[in-house]
A protein has these predicted regions:
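Short, aromatic-enriched amphipathic alpha-helices that serve as compact interaction elements
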Residues: 34-50, 64
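Bacterial N-terminal signal peptides
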Residues: 8-16
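Short solvent-exposed beta->alpha transition segments
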Residues: 52-108
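Alpha-helical scaffold domains
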Residues: 29-30
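Sec/Tat signal peptide C-region and signal peptidase I cleavage site
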Residues: 18-24
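Exposed beta-sheet edge and beta->alpha loop/turn motif
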Residues: 101-157
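Bacterial N-terminal signal peptides that target proteins for export
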Residues: 1-9
Length: 157
């Protein structure tokens, strides 16, 4: 009985420790990450959404969402539903992407993002990041404020 209890406890402890380590692998904003790199981090994570744990790509993307954006989308479970919905599901496990700078200032940067989804259809997005200017741990960090609805560009075939 004691051995069985100890084994069960060990399995639960190992599972908890393993989950904690994988979530620790996610990147968090810091003021040394450039605007285009924020988008690269988000797109690379979404490209392999379940690589670290279920929905790790979505959670990685959430980490770089501007607080105002998070207020609009609601908590993380709502954000996950939004990304998995019709408007943005093509971002999940997409095959490739390109990021092209459209314009910037010291406070914002806008990019055109074209992704090739797993159905081999291209989609274009306008993606904007802004430098967080309020006091706190995010001060000076570039964070996503806007991702447009996708514009389908057609098939790659």
């Amino acid at each position: 009985m004691l051995k069985k209890l100890l084994l069960t406890f060990s399995v639960v402890l190992f599972s908890f420790f393993n989950i904690s380590l994988t979530k620790a692998d996610l990147l968090f904003p810091n003021n040394s990450i450039f605007p285009a790199d924020v988008i690269k981090i988000q797109l690379n994570a979404l490209m392999d959404n379940d690589s670290k744990f279920k929905d790790s790509g979505i959670e990685q993307t959430w980490n770089f969402a501007h607080p105002n954006n998070k207020k609009n989308t609601g908590p993380l479970p709502n954000f996950k539903m939004m990304i998995k919905g019709n408007s943005y599901k093509m971002l999940l496990n997409h095959l490739s992407h390109t990021i092209t700078a459209l314009g910037s200032s010291n406070e914002w940067a806008q990019f055109e993002v074209v992704i090739l989804d797993k159905e081999k259809i291209y989609h274009k997005f306008n993606w904007q990041v802004e430098k967080f200017t309020m006091d706190g741990p995010l001060r000076g960090c570039w964070l996503t404020t806007v991702v447009s609805n996708p514009i389908p560009l057609g098939s790659s075939i």
